[in-house]
Amino acid sequence: MSYPGYPPPPGGYPPAAPGGGPWGGAAYPPPPSMPPIGLDNVATYAGQFNQDYLSGMAANMSGTFGGANMPNLYPGAPGAGYPPVPPGGFGQPPSAQQPVPPYGMYPPPGGNPPSRMPSYPPYPGAPVPGQPMPPPGQQPPGAYPGQPPVTYPGQPPVPLPGQQQPVPSYPGYPGSGTVTPAVPPTQFGSRGTITDAPGFDPLRDAEVLRKAMKGFGTDEQAIIDCLGSRSNKQRQQILLSFKTAYGKDLIKDLKSELSGNFEKTILALMKTPVLFDIYEIKEAIKGVGTDEACLIEILASRSNEHIRELNRAYKAEFKKTLEEAIRSDTSGHFQRLLISLSQGNRDESTNVDMSLAQRDAQELYAAGENRLGTDESKFNAVLCSRSRAHLVAVFNEYQRMTGRDIEKSICREMSGDLEEGMLAVVKCLKNTPAFFAERLNKAMRGAGTKDRTLIRIMVSRSETDLLDIRSEYKRMYGKSLYHDISGDTSGDYRKILLKICGGND
């Protein structure tokens, strides 16, 4: 069985006239007398090049695909060339043709009304795609000095430097016209006392640690100097290099050589941040009693990404979910607060819709001070889902509206673990460094020291915001954190904590 037109007739497609090629001109392949290809024959080929061959090919393609206006491939042919530049340049549409809408302004399919989402770019003053962002204080690209910057169709005009920038309202909240950008959050990890050590060599550090623990006695100062000045990422490399070089587990060697709170601090430094947190949570809920403050401290202060990693690591390490662990050891509204925080689903935007902030403040007032009893679920929903920037605005609005700080209202309306938990969440959201400064002060105040809290905060915040915590501590208590650690601890334990602290204020 054969199909019409198949196999193709001899000579290729389309059929060629006798003695000619399928596209016109001389037949292909070339006659046997054609010289071999080489650099010395390029000139010969150029002299034999047949323009009629490709011109015929173009005419045939035009007929095949229905193109009536395909330009001739060679400018010298009659009628060849592209049409002249229309008036106004190629950016103007041809006559009797509708202009092409700009990017982001095409109507949706099916005849639906256009979306209310802003067209590209989504914020005023953004650079034209492909152009670099101008330095601060410099005119955006596309504008002459003294003239407004270029904007896309459908965008509001971009203000000149020094003028106030109009901020769009969030859609979906009627009457919202006051959206203010929050102060950009400090970059994670940019205010720690420990950073990557320059010139880091994990094999050399592994050798230092090996010598410090080899033979009779231990050189604790060498361990402090080495591990207390390396970032967590670098410590993980030291672990691997130690095992590679000596075939031994550095953690086991450290456990066998160290003791007490000094050992606990060094081992805390050697864990990754996520692994350290899940073991702190495990310790907080095991046995008789629960360290509720530890649970709230970790879950209220960590980022969404970190909390999600906590959930994955907890399940992998302990064969049960973090939520199951919380449910097994807590109850009531405090349990609901912890479970809400453990989802890692807080809004992380930095813009504030003031009308929504006012509404949330009114609803918190209606759920607490302005009713008999307290609707704890409303506090839970607002405090665990709204962004940090939004909640700061809510707390300020609550103070303005009621004349009372929201922390005092929580103390009046709640009690026990729930009161402590809600207060910790509010304080952490208001001012995270101040929250940790207060926790450190309480850990060292009075008889005895809450060493687990002291170690946990010093280690977990050492690469995040310990410099800010030191500043808040000095402001709140009139003494430096370094001073109080020196007076409340001793020995190598004091030395490693002061090394992490990073200096006296």
UniProtKB/Swiss-Prot annotation:
GO terms for biological process: cytokinetic process; phagocytosis; response to calcium ion. GO terms for cellular component: azurophil granule; collagen-containing extracellular matrix; cytoplasm; cytosol; extracellular exosome; intracellular membrane-bounded organelle; melanosome; membrane. Residues 1-17, 99-160 have a biased composition (Pro residues). Belongs to the annexin family. This is Annexin A11. Signal peptide: none annotated. Its main location: cytoplasm. Residues 1-38, 84-199 are annotated as: Disordered. The modification N6-acetyllysine is found at residues 248, 255, 479. Residues 161-177 have a biased composition (Low complexity). Changing residue 40 to G: In ALS23; forms cytoplasmic aggregates in patient tissues; no effect on nuclear and cytoplasmic localization; loss of interaction with S100A6. Pfam families: Annexin (PF00191). Changing residue 189 to E: In ALS23; uncertain significance; no effect on aggregation; loss of interaction with S100A6.
